[in-house]
Regions:
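Ferredoxin-type iron-sulfur electron-transfer modules in oxidoreductases and energy-metabolism complexes
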Residues: 1-7, 21-45, 62-91, 142-159, ...
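Gly-rich Lys/Arg/Thr-decorated short loops/hinges at beta-loop-alpha junctions or inter-strand turns
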Residues: 10, 126-129, 134-141, 191-205, ...
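Conserved phosphate/anionic-ligand binding catalytic regions in large, soluble enzymes, centered on
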Residues: 16, 139, 159-181, 280-292, ...
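Short amphipathic, charge-patterned alpha-helical segments
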Residues: 32, 219-221, 370-386
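Iron-sulfur cluster-binding cysteine motifs and their immediate structural context
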Residues: 54-58, 460-466, 544, 554-573, ...
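Flexible inter-domain linker/hinge segments
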Residues: 93-162, 314, 321-336
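Hydrophobic alpha-helical positions that pack around
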Residues: 115, 244-370, 382
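C-terminal accessory/binding modules appended to enzymatic or scaffolding proteins
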Residues: 350-362, 368, 532-580, 584
């Protein structure tokens, strides 16, 4: 790369790709070639920069100019102004929301200031389909060092001392997991990379595979050396076509370079990787269900013991780690256990990648040191709540996580603190909610997902969650009672205590955490038949104003349930008992005589007046 004077990096992650970053890349390349600059300026497709809210992203080196929301039509101006004349295109620069000033370098953006990219270190920096660029960024150096300088047990001890824990949700110590697998003798062992990522809205693992697949392949080979495995399998959901494409390319390139396959680097160690495709079932994030799916069986969890490290894929000892966990391994080997363990908290070392979403200004992929607070993530990295709304809650840990309140904003991000607060780390989903969100409806939404994703093997999860969802539906429809609230708490606790796997054991978390933190909303739904956020349609009331209605009958004609009565040129009335809250009457009324109320007492008052 040294022969080029300038490098233009174009984000080619799935998010930017869907916003035509591929056309941006092609237009920039064509424009550079047209100007005869192909020998001086290199156009590179990279992985995700993380700032998905502002994509497509284009970054120009060596001056680190960061352009946002670039369109294909902007390519000529970027080449003419920046590449040729050395002048920034100001209209494409990021604008600081507070100072309203343009920011040239991403290092000075609030979104990036508190991030520390370890697992994402190469995403947005290299072409993931070019192994030479990965090698230039130290890819496979850790594997070479391990194979030539360390024994398997010495390598495991490095991972143990680093304090690396599983990033897939449970947080089990990675070094200990490898040690257990290494102690079980067998004629064949397996290393499995869990790239299924079944959480809705989560894209941490996908982005790593799209942006830096060689870091994962290298880590799998290191793990294979440590536990005595010669075969690796990547279990990836078929819905990740770009990640699959780049991973296939990376595997082929690594084989060509002698970094996978027989006799790696002439050391006598052999290890190869193949891929298995999943259908995206959430339950297959659980390692025994994942293994069953890989074997062509139904994706159902099984009782432990035996653990996969004892009897896993095809009955052989199997080590399962997720993508983010593995991506940390090579850099730990190169920089040392002490370096990694100095980052984070006493029990949670290193960094964590989160998919930041919801009612927040800066939606995207972030990587932060363990111990950073929710407040710092939401207000400094995330840029605060959209449209000046008031913060209400943050849901962490995916669909099985808990909803935390403003009182929890100073909670540090680590496994123990989030669990103590009533939520969990999970794989890294983080959804911010504002004042317009109904917490009862939110709990119902997430529970609806786990009901659909339950494998059905154990009764507490299969039946219990369905009963929970039915009870929440009853409450959001204005038919709930005080007994229903007690039922939610009691049944949720039973499901947590008696379910077979992590899906069932954590599935009641959205319900139990909202009961703990937002009981007033449940009571309003049950006793006042009111949804303060206006999200529960059955608790909304359309009312016709006697002062404004002229009796044109337009609303009456469009009502599908004949809930509106009244004669021509007389005030009309809506029968609340049979109104289905479709809103057709309000859309049809040309005199603004129909209003939508959230409070039933106000409905009675409006009718009486």
């Amino acid at each position: 790369m040294s022969q080029y004077k300038m490098h233009v990096l174009v984000c080619a992650g799935t998010g930017c790709h869907s916003s035509e970053s591929n056309l941006v890349y092609e237009m920039l390349r064509d424009e550079v070639d047209r100007k005869g600059l192909g020998r001086e300026v290199q156009i590179i497709r990279t992985g995700c920069f993380g700032f998905c809210e502002k994509g497509p992203i284009v970054k120009i080196l060596p001056d680190n100019t960061f352009y946002t929301q670039v369109k294909p039509s902007d390519a000529r101006e970027i080449v003419d102004e920046h590449v040729i004349k050395g002048r920034s295109v100001h209209r494409l620069l990021y604008t600081d929301p507070e100072t309203k000033e343009h920011v040239l370098d991403s290092k000075h953006m609030g979104f990036y200031k508190k991030q520390l990219r370890i697992a994402l270190r190469n995403c947005g920096t290299i072409d993931p389909e070019n192994i030479d660029e990965s090698i230039a960024r130290n890819a496979y150096q850790a594997l070479g060092r391990v194979l030539t300088e360390y024994s398997p047990q010495e390598t495991i001890e490095i991972i143990k001392r680093s304090g690396l824990r599983g990033r897939g949700g449970a947080g089990f110590p990675t070094g200990l997991k490898w040690k257990i697998a290494s102690r079980n003798d067998a004629d064949q062992k397996y290393v499995v990379c869990n790239a299924d990522e079944g959480d809705p809205g989560a894209f941490m693992d996908r982005s790593i595979l799209e942006g830096d697949p060689h870091s994962v392949l290298e880590a799998m080979a290191i793990c294979g050396y440590c536990i005595g495995a010669t075969k690796g399998l990547v279990y990836i959901r078929a819905e990740y076509p770009l990640a699959i494409k780049r991973l296939k390319t990376a595997i082929a390139q690594a084989r060509d370079y002698g970094l996978l396959g027989e006799n790696i680097l002439g050391t006598g160690f052999s290890f190869d990787v193949s891929m298995k495709y999943g259908a995206g079932a959430f339950v297959c994030g659980e390692e025994t269900a994942l293994i069953h799916s890989m074997e062509g069986k139904r994706g159902e969890p099984s009782n432990k013991p035996p653990f996969p490290a004892q009897s896993g894929y095809l009955g052989k000892p199997t080590n399962v780690n997720n993508v983010e966990t593995l991506a940390n391994v090579p850099v730990i080997i190169l920089k040392g256990a002490d370096w990694f363990s100095a980052i984070g908290t006493e029990k949670s070392k290193g960094t964590k990648v989160f998919a930041l979403a919801g009612k927040i200004n800066n939606v995207g992929l972030i990587e932060v040191p363990m111990g950073i607070t929710l407040r710092e993530i939401i207000y400094e990295i995330g840029g605060g709540i959209k449209n000046g709304k008031k913060f209400k809650a943050v849901q962490t840990g995916g669909p099985s996580g808990g909803c935390l309140t403003e009182e929890h904003l100073d909670t540090p991000i680590d496994y123990e603190s989030l669990t103590a607060a009533g939520s969990m780390m999970g794989s890294g989903g983080m959804i911010v909610l504002d004042e317009d969100d109904c917490m009862v409806s939110v709990a119902k939404f997430f529970l609806g997902f786990t009901v659909e994703e339950s494998c059905g093997k154990c009764a507490p999860c299969r039946i219990g969650n369905k009963r929970l969802h039915e009870t929440l539906t009853k409450i959001t429809e204005g038919k709930g009672t005080q007994e229903d609230i007690e039922k939610l708490r009691n049944l949720g606790s039973v499901i947590k205590d008696t379910s077979l796997c992590g899906l069932g054991q954590t599935s009641p978390n959205p319900v139990l955490s909202t009961l703990d933190n937002f009981m007033d909303e449940y009571l309003e739904h049950v006793h006042d038949k009111k949804c303060r956020s206006g999200q529960c349609r059955s608790l909304l009331y359309y009312v016709i104003s006697a002062d404004d209605c002229i009796g044109c009958m337009a609303c009456k004609r469009v009502c599908p349930t004949h809930a509106i009565s009244g004669e021509k040129k007389e005030v009309h009335v809506i029968n609340q008992e049979i109104c289905i809250k479709c809103g057709a009457c309000m859309e049809k009324c040309q005199f603004d005589a129909i209003s939508l109320l959230k409070d039933y007492p106000r409905v009675a008052e409006a009718i009486n007046n």
